[in-house]
A protein has these predicted regions:
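C-terminal structured domains
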Residues: 243-336
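Long, hydrophobic alpha/beta structural blocks
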Residues: 1-4, 9-17, 21-25, 29-281
Length: 336
């Protein structure tokens, strides 16, 4: 999938003796091949991180002004990326000053389009010391961007925001006391909705099992174990970690499942307490009409007790319990 970069800027946030200093760079950098690669790498690395939270802009724009800065940017023609990023840097500086654990770095801002949706990516990247070869086959120190090591990043789905979607901001969670300032810089309200988060996780797990081409017994086992893991967290009132879930549920290749759960387009909140009421679809099917209702476990399909005919949209049940059989025989004998 192509990231079409519209605008990009890089500024610096430096920590000096307990305070922070902002150094502005160019606010409308050229999209060179190198810049495209850097933004593509940041986007891909952000997408792979499992520990993310999602939310929407907080109501208090005076305390959390990023929304109004972004609104002004989108309403100005031509859009003023310089003003947006400068104001956001001041907000970042202010929020970082409130948190002792906050650090600085190179702050990347990228406005890009992906699959007909527009995003603003913000990432703080530091440098690390490496080595390179010289022309006479010696080694020398060289500093370069630590792309894999960034801890602070967020993405605003501007199209989702404009369309009134419920969740359009995502950011890396990390340790709460460290990442909290970045969340407040974005102005993100992350009110947790455990039942909704659980239902969305269930749908993602079911889709994963289908996409992996699991046969029916394997799919039943996978989803049943997922339910057991989630119920364990729910009973203990412990937050569910996607990384831990993937490692236990798919120990042979946890990366495949983690990649799905981390997909920012799914907007799955990592680190919520599962709601047991929303776990049923992992092992149950149910439905009703005005005249009847039905519920059965997945293993009923595996054992052949329930058969679905997709062509005529009918369901056949076998192995009916004796009490139900007796009631039906009595009912039909009266009719006869």
């Amino acid at each position: 999938v192509t990231n079409t970069i519209i605008r990009v800027a890089i500024h610096d946030l430096t920590k000096t003796q307990g305070s922070f200093v902002v150094k502005h760079g160019k606010s409308d950098l050229k999209v060179t091949q190198t810049m495209q690669r850097v933004i593509d790498d940041l986007t891909a690395l952000y997408a792979k991180r499992t520990s993310k939270s999602y939310g929407k802009f907080a109501v208090d724009e005076d305390r959390f002004p990023t929304e109004k800065h972004l609104r002004a940017y989108l309403n100005v023609q031509p859009s003023d990326f310089t003003t947006l990023t400068h104001k956001m840097m001041e907000t970042l500086k202010a929020q970082a000053s409130y948190k002792g654990a906050a650090t600085g770095g190179h702050v990347f801002f990228a406005h890009f389009e992906r699959e007909e949706r527009q995003y603003l990516l913000i990432a703080i990247v530091n440098e690390k010391l490496g080595a390179s070869m010289t022309s006479d086959l010696d080694v020398q120190d060289v500093r370069h961007l630590d792309m894999d090591g960034f801890r602070f990043a967020g993405r605003i789905n501007m199209t989702g925001w404009a369309n009134g979607e419920e969740r359009y901001i995502g950011f890396l969670k990390g340790k709460r006391e460290v990442s909290e300032y970045f969340m407040e810089f974005l102005g993100c309200d992350t009110t947790v909705q455990n039942r909704r988060d659980t239902a969305e996780l269930v749908q993602a797990l079911m889709a994963f099992a289908t996409d992996e081409g699991m046969d029916t017994p394997s799919k039943d086992d996978f989803l049943a174990r997922a339910k057991t893991i989630c119920e364990r967290s729910a009973k203990a009132q412990e937050e569910l970690s996607f990384e831990a879930l993937a490692n236990e549920l798919s120990p042979q290749d946890p990366e495949r499942l983690m990649t799905v759960l981390a997909d920012p387009d799914l907007r799955l909140n990592d680190g919520f307490v599962p709601d047991r009421r929303a776990l049923g679809p992992l092992i149950k099917f149910k439905g009703k009409t005005p005249t009847w209702s039905i519920e059965f476990n997945r293993d009923a399909i595996t054992r052949g007790n329930v058969r679905f005919n997709a062509e005529d949209n009918t369901l056949t049940l076998t192995g009916l319990p004796e009490d139900l059989t007796a009631q039906l025989r009595a009912e039909y004998s009266q009719d006869g």
